Amino acid sequence: MKRIHKKNKPQIFSTMQAKTTVFLILLMSGLFSSPLFSQQTWSLQDCIDHALTHNIELRLQRFNEEDAAYSLEQSYANFFPTLDANMSHGYSFGRSVDPFTNEFSTERIMRQNARASSSVVLFAGFQNVNYLRYNILRNTAFRFDTEKLQNEIILTIGAAYMQVLYSEDFVETAEQQLEVISQQLERTRALFEGGTLPRGSVLEIEARLAEEELNLITARNNLRMAYIELIQLLDLDPAEEFNIERPVTQVDEEFVILDAESVFEKALNVQPAIMSANSRIMMAEKQIELDRGRRSPVLSLNADLGTGYSQAAMQFAGREGLGPVQIGYLEDNTPVFTDGFNNIMEIKPYRDQIRDNFYQYVGLSLRIPIVNRWEVRTRIQHSKVDLLRARDQYELTRNNLNKAIQQAHADALAAYQKYEATIKSLDAFNESFHYTRQRFDLGMVSSVEFNESQTRLARAEREALQAKYDYIFKVKIMEFYMGEGFRL
């Protein structure tokens, strides 16, 4: 860990005026009169919240997460028994066997059946348990994927937001440089009219003024483009009112740059890309257990009940007398008679059939896989390949994160060193310019020397401004890797 202390808080722009003055200058230029730059202000958090809510790519990713949640619900439901019920009503024609009488019939018969069945798996090689654990891991992996995409969006929005802040400050710098040159032009003209300076000095300052006006136009265009880029990232209508809030973006007097190893160790526990890759390793391991479970016998408990009705089901309804009926002869050929009768049959009542045909069944079933054309073996081999792929993907993600943190650490340290150097350079050029301007007003230096001094100062101010925002952004990236979010 490296701790750096600053004794004095540097000011980037020694000639920077009050914010109210800058606002009035920009208002006069018409910048804030356009629909893009109105009175409505958005903070960085407002922009991030809006992007996370309305980003289409993120919404698509959330569909994957929602789909994984439904699969997880199904995993819990797989432990419940199945319950089915069915009813049928129909007619049979021609020769058929009635299921309730077991007799052949050639007449049209109306039949009805009602049946309910249930089944529950008692053992299947722990497939339901493993499938549940697999979907828990899958749901977790998709959630981390969503967080990873959210992080990418936050970084993109943060970078675009800071680009707008930088562009606004750059416009202020250009405005101030233009104001300095305008004031110097007035003094130069006065000195020329007083005979102290030649006309060439006035022309040199006027040329410098035209150059600064061009710089201001370029700065305003860059600001407009920065706003447009941010608006496009937020999927807003460019015609709507939009302006950002200006947070305090000063460099701290005392700050700490953690070593890259410490940041990396913390990032391993908070970065969703790492946790997603790790979840997929566990998913692949659980998939192998699932596939191996297909080799196990499946023991199920089954229950069934039902009843039915048939028009072919008849019952005895009485007898019909036929009078004396000869049934044979005695030895002496005397005929033998008895009272004849016919049995009267009727269709068995519906309620009685439903009651009498009611049946129940409870039993166990065991299915033992013997030969399945190497299907299970092939599944297991595929799952092992997926496990190796997931492990390599984790290592790749881990290495990429380590490289990114190492690079971010080096960038942050270099950005601070550059910022320190530009501040020192700015202080020196600022003092040199004031000294040159005093000598120029006395006619002791030429307009060429004055313009060169002012050009060096303007360049130093721009470099200091760029170094400031570059350093702040690099530090925010380091904080983001440690799970501290992106805040200004």
What are these regions (language model features)?
Residues 63, 75-77, 211-236, 419, ...:
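Short segments within alpha-helical structural elements
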Residues 1-50, 220-265, 311, 315-319, ...:
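Terminal intrinsically disordered/low-complexity segments used for targeting and assembly
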Residues 38-88, 94, 238, 244-289, ...:
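Bacterial Sec-pathway N-terminal export signals of envelope proteins
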Residues 115-117, 161, 264, 363-365, ...:
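Membrane-embedded beta-strand positions in outer-membrane beta-barrel channels/transporters
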Residues 152-266, 411, 415, 435, ...:
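Periplasmic alpha-helical coiled-coil/stalk elements that build and connect Gram-negative outer-membrane
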Residues 111-115, 159, 204, 211, ...:
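Transmembrane beta-barrel architecture of outer-membrane proteins
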Residues 86-120, 247-255, 289, 302-368, ...:
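Small/polar, glycine/serine/threonine/aspartate-rich low-complexity segments that form flexible
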Residues 59-63, 76-77, 108, 122-150, ...:
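Sec/SRP-type N-terminal targeting helices
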